[in-house]
Amino acid sequence: MEFKLKHKDGMARVCEITTAHSTFLTPVFMPVGTVGAVKSLDANDMKNELDAKIILANTYHMYLRPTSKVVKDFGGLHGFTKFDRSFLTDSGGFQAFSLSKNSKHFNEGIEFKSHIDGSRHLFTPKSVLDTQYDFNSDIMMILDDLVALPATKERVKISVDRTILWAKEAITYHKNMQNKGIGIGQNIFGIIQGGTDYEERKRCALSLNEMPFDGLAIGGLSVGEENALMYETVQNLNPYLDENRPRYLMGVGTPEDLVENVERGVDMFDCVMPTRNARNGTFFTSFGKFNIKKAEFINDHEVIDSTCSCYTCRNFSRGYLNHLFKAKELTFFRLASLHNLHYYLELARKMREAILNNSFTQFKRNFYHLRGK
């Protein structure tokens, strides 16, 4: 992976990242394709309508079904999905933690029950990389020990100890595998844990900074803490992160979260929010969000957002979308998802432009002004 820090405006950054499959600028938002597809959309939509340069797939789900061996047989995620740009795959640790009622965390790894058939599985620092080697993802995430917030100081310390231990195992294993010709062209990111505890976050960041990861992620946020505490945690980490590596805030978030955390030096984001909200009838716009199911939209001839150039806004009225949603027409999911993802990707583009023009502060002011804040 090639990484170039191109420009800074305060702590906000524009960087260029090149993987084996695409080059993209940050800040970047990565649409989430949990089971190898962004819900209701295909590779053509992602490339031709949205021009997404990188998307995320989930190791937990793809490991269980169809299994990594099946994906490998199709030539990895790129051959399986026909999306020939970059893939980032998470380690599956979050889903093992959140979807399995009886998951157990040990120093060896995470034991969990499949949400599909109840079978038992063990994720270890090595096994999740083996799975991601089969996927041939461009960016692989290591296994980390996530804790729900609020958590006791003792549990947070255990989480950081374990995450550092697993990071050492993962980076050593990855280097050994590359020496054997496996994982060539695949990059590995470490994950910083520590809850909202300043000292534990700092300890984890300093430890992982010493390891030769291609990038560093901030995990374990947006899991129950107040937004202000999330922003403070990210800002406090900034001095301890290597400036010459990508910074990825996992699972975040709202448009406001993106703006606030770009201001605090974050480069990469992913979240299911744009597509999940789309399926529930909620649209993101330059003036805020609204739900299309309201009766006031039945005879509305306007498009979702007159400033938007997405496929949906170029072609369809609020009245038509209101009808599709109420009729439970599957077409609605695609049209709504296209709009919301276009909004997120365009928000990232506008932030890049503002940073390059040294006008991010003004951009943020206008962003909130349009929302009446």
Curated annotation (Swiss-Prot):
Gene Ontology BP, a term: tRNA-guanine transglycosylation
Comment on bound cofactor: Binds 1 zinc ion per subunit.
GO molecular function: metal ion binding; tRNA-guanosine(34) queuine transglycosylase activity
Reactions this protein catalyses: 7-aminomethyl-7-carbaguanine + guanosine(34) in tRNA = 7-aminomethyl-7-carbaguanosine(34) in tRNA + guanine
Residue numbers binding substrate: 90-94, 144, 193, 220
Binding site for Zn(2+): 308, 310, 313, 339
Region span, RNA binding: 251-257, 275-279
Cofactor: Zn(2+)
Keywords, in A-Z order: Glycosyltransferase, Metal-binding, Queuosine biosynthesis, Transferase, tRNA processing, Zinc
Pathway it works in: tRNA modification; tRNA-queuosine biosynthesis
Alphabetical list of Gene3D superfamilies matching this protein: Queuine tRNA-ribosyltransferase-like (3.20.20.105)
EC id: 2.4.2.29
Function: Catalyzes the base-exchange of a guanine (G) residue with the queuine precursor 7-aminomethyl-7-deazaguanine (PreQ1) at position 34 (anticodon wobble position) in tRNAs with GU(N) anticodons (tRNA-Asp, -Asn, -His and -Tyr). Catalysis occurs through a double-displacement mechanism. The nucleophile active site attacks the C1' of nucleotide 34 to detach the guanine base from the RNA, forming a covalent enzyme-RNA intermediate. The proton acceptor active site deprotonates the incoming PreQ1, allowing a nucleophilic attack on the C1' of the ribose to form the product.
UniProt protein name: Queuine tRNA-ribosyltransferase
Organism listed in the record: Campylobacter jejuni subsp. jejuni serotype O:2 (strain ATCC 700819 / NCTC 11168)
Lineage, uppermost ranks: Bacteria, Pseudomonadati, Campylobacterota, Epsilonproteobacteria, Campylobacterales
